[in-house]
Structures are given as C-alpha cells and as structure tokens.
C-alpha cells in the first residue's frame, strides 16, 4: 500500500475520532437541555405558586452566616408577595435555557445564561446547598444540585483547547482543569459525608425517611428497606460512602481501564443517592423543583468517560 493511501487512511480515522468526540459532547448537551426542560415543567406545578414555596426558600437561610441568610430571606419575602409573577418568570427562564441549549445556534448564550442563573439560585434559593450551615450531605443533594448545572455548562462549553482530548469534559477547559474540578467536587462530597452531623447513628436513616412524604408506595417501600439497613449505622455508612467518594475522586487520574471502573462506581453511587437519599428529587410528590443531584452526577461521570484518542496502528506504524 502506498504512503499516500496510508496517510489518507489515518486522516480519515482521525476525522472519525473527532466526529465521535463532537457527537459525545452534543449528546451530553442535549441531556442537560432535557433536564432543564424538566425543571421548567416542575417549576410550573401548583405548589410553586403557593405560600409554601416561599417558605421552602426561606428555610434554606437557617444556619447560614448573616451575609448569606439575609438575601435569602429577602428573596423568600419577595416571592411570597409576587408568587404568580415571579414563579412564571422562573419557569420561563428554565424553559428558555433548555430550549437554548437544545438549539445549536444559541447553545453558547444558553449555557452562559444557565451559569448565571444557577449561581443565583444556589445562593438565593438553595442557601449554598447547606455548605456553610453544616447541613450539607451527599444524600440530600450537597453541594447543591444547581451548582452542578453550572459546572456541566462550563465543561460542555462548545470550544476546544486541545485537538484530541482524553475525555469530553476536557475539551473546553483542558484535562488538568477538568480533572481538578472533578477532584474538588467528589472530595468535597467525601468531606460532607464525614461531618459530625452526618456521622450520627441515625443521621442517614433520618435523611432517607424524611423524603417519604408524598412518595408513591413502591418508592416508600424501597426507602424503608434502605433506612432499616442503616438504622444506627450512621458512622459506618458515612465512612463507607466517604471511601467510595475518594476512590471516585482519584479515578480520573488513573489509566483508562481503571478510570472507567471509577466512573461506573460514580454512576452507581449517583443512582443510590438519587433513589434512596433524594427519592428521585421529589419529582413524584408535586413539590420537587428539580430531579436533584443524582442524575447530574451521573451525567458528569459520562462527560469524563475516556475517549479513544489514538488511531489504531498509528503508534506501531510510526
């Protein structure tokens, strides 16, 4: 075979690898868009137009420093006074973000808007996810589901710093930054799992049973089974979870086969958190504003799945 033919074959294979990477990022963007659209639908539930919604927002101020709590209380009072108008605005913003990400020409504007909106909601609506109040727990959505939306927007930004990134999340910010962001997130979850409040004997049991109100019977049965397993085992459960989270955090620094194992573990942990700790984000109760952190953590793991960045036979031929 001539050198020209070999070179042409390599170029074609490189093109296919580039297309694979582009398609992977676009697929993840579309999943993120679907979650934003689900949020918009959930935001339009009747509960969100009631006084109870503003009270739920106000409750996130508890335990936070005054400089953080006062704006939350102000926001809750404002929502109470103008519930219909403001909740309609909230739902519309989320709808526009979802549609904007799904529509390729507006994806940059929508992702940028989602970062700004997520940061505002993280403070004014989630009380920074309980990070400063001592209430943060991986099983109740720490460090705040909405800040993970912002992280995903950054990692799925349609730009390329390197020609062939090792995983999708590295394309926009580079592998070193992407791995550092992953490390910070999962190590923070490990830290939250080991805080004194979460090591208490009945801590995890209480988190699981607290989500039962309004759930369908089958989900209550699942949660009750999980709660019984961890009854009085708060310390052991916290240590076990923290170890798993540390393994996940370090996984993206390993070679692809080991990294894939760590990422599968991340998806499994995200699923366990979502089903048993977050009760599917409360989306079946009529009061859930979003699916919570579980699906977002799983989506994040997919963004770090190793891509095939070398052309088969290329190194041998060289």
Please annotate each region the language model reported.
Residues 2-96, 103-318:
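Extended, low-polarity transmembrane helix blocks
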């Amino acid at each position: 075979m001539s050198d020209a033919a070999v070179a042409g074959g390599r170029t074609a294979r490189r093109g296919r690898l580039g297309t694979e990477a582009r398609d992977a990022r676009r697929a993840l963007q579309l999943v993120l868009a679907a979650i934003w659209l689900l949020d918009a639908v959930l935001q339009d539930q009747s509960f969100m137009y009631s006084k109870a919604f503003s009270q739920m927002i106000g409750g996130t101020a508890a335990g936070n420093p005054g400089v953080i709590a006062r704006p939350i209380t102000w926001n809750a009072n404002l929502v109470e006074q103008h519930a219909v108008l403001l909740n309609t605005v909230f739902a519309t913003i989320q709808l526009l973000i979802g549609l904007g990400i799904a529509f390729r020409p507006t994806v940059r504007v929508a992702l940028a808007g989602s970062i700004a909106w997520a940061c505002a909601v993280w403070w004014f609506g989630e009380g920074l996810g309980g990070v400063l109040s001592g209430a943060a727990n991986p099983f109740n959505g720490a460090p705040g589901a909405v800040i993970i939306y912002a992280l995903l927007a950054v990692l799925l930004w349609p730009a390329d710093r390197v020609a062939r990134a090792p995983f999708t999340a590295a394309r926009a910010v580079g592998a070193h930054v992407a791995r550092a962001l992953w490390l910070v997130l999962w190590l923070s979850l490990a830290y939250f799992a080991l805080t004194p409040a979460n090591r208490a004997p009945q801590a995890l049991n209480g988190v699981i049973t607290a989500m039962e109100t309004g759930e369908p019977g089958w989900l209550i049965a699942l949660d009750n089974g999980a709660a019984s397993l961890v009854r009085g085992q708060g310390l052991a459960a916290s240590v076990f979870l923290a170890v798993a989270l540390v393994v996940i955090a370090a996984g993206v620094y390993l070679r692809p086969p080991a990294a894939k194992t760590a990422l599968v573990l991340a998806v499994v942990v995200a699923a366990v958190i979502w089903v048993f700790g977050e009760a599917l984000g409360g989306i079946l109760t009529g009061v859930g504003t979003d699916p919570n952190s579980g699906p977002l953590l799983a989506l994040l793991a997919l963004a770090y799945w190793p891509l095939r960045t070398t052309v088969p036979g290329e190194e041998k031929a060289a």
